[in-house]
Amino acid sequence: MKRIYFISVVALALGLGAVRVTAERRAQEAKPDAKNEHAYSGMYTFLKEGEFVQVTVEDTGHVTGFVSRFGDGESDKGAFLDQFFKSGKLDGNQLSFTTDIVHGVSFDFKGTVERGDGKNPGDEAYFLLKGRLTESASDVNKKVSAHSQEVVFKMFPQDGAPAAVERK
């Protein structure tokens, strides 16, 4: 009888230990790995179908990249425009960037990098950019208007993304 009791106690202890290890592993997977910030580098969706933002994380937390989008103005309607980052920073999972002004429009993003629904690195939506995007536009009279919205940009799958373009 003591032997059965002992075996039951050992089995219960091992089972609880396995549950704890599994819970800890899931908690770690849910958080982006701040030690491997380069993993955040990649191409993410942007506001419209066919538009994207390329994010490249450097060693120091400095972020470079660009937004590729369709023009909305009368002179650039439907044209594909690239807006390089004027500044960009990653601190832990806090991401911010501001683009150059192109045809009177610039973008400012402040938010976080978070784990998405992708199961493995390289899967679609493995990482997400969540935050507030502010679009500033100036007209011919230099009057500036700003529109701000909450956004979620999903990382493209690694095999489906074209190679990154280096900024010169």
Each language-model region and where it sits:
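Central antiparallel beta-sheet cores of small beta-barrel/beta-sandwich binding domains
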Residues: R26-K168
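Bacterial N-terminal signal peptides
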Residues: S8-G17
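Sec/Tat signal peptide C-region and signal peptidase I cleavage site
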Residues: A18-T22
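Bacterial N-terminal signal peptides that target proteins for export
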Residues: M1-S8
